[in-house]
Amino acid sequence: RLESTMRRTLLMPFQEILIAGRDFEFLQGRRWALKELQQYPLICLGSETMTYAFYNQFYLSNNLVLQPDTEAATTDQVVPLVKSGLGLGYVPQNFAKDALAAGDVFTIQLKEEIPTRHVVLVQDGGRVPNAAAREFARMLNSSVTQQNAP
């Protein structure tokens, strides 16, 4: 929850996918329930991240407990860990694009739908932003506008 003076602006949606490396090719070709996949090692971001909180809630909403075997410090570490065969991992679709195209990883089809997430700009309306903060917000909004242009 945000303080009453805080403003949030949805910048762009993104979809995450569950990926696996070649060691888990036997998981291709069908849809899996989360419960069925709990026997396989899971790579997730650390418990102090919003991504962990998001997946913790996702698992709880499906009557499961999130129990990662490996915690990565950043999202860009998940794809190499998955490629190395250390487990399955959730990443934004665009993070896995190159590894998917190269055949190093594949998408695991889930029966449950992973909710869409959003990149959000949060600003304190009770404070006047300095020049750097104003420019950063302008650049973010401009970048998103350009990406969403036809």
Residue ranges and their predicted role:
Residues 21, 45-46, 68, 91:
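Thr-Gly-centered strand-to-loop micro-motif
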Residues 53-108:
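Hydrophobic hinge/microswitch elements
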Residues 18-19, 42, 107, 121:
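Generic preference for hydrophobic
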Residues 9, 35, 79-80, 97, ...:
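Alpha-helical segments flanking ligand/cofactor-binding loops in enzyme cores
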Residues 26, 41-62, 129-131, 137, ...:
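Secondary-structure junction motif
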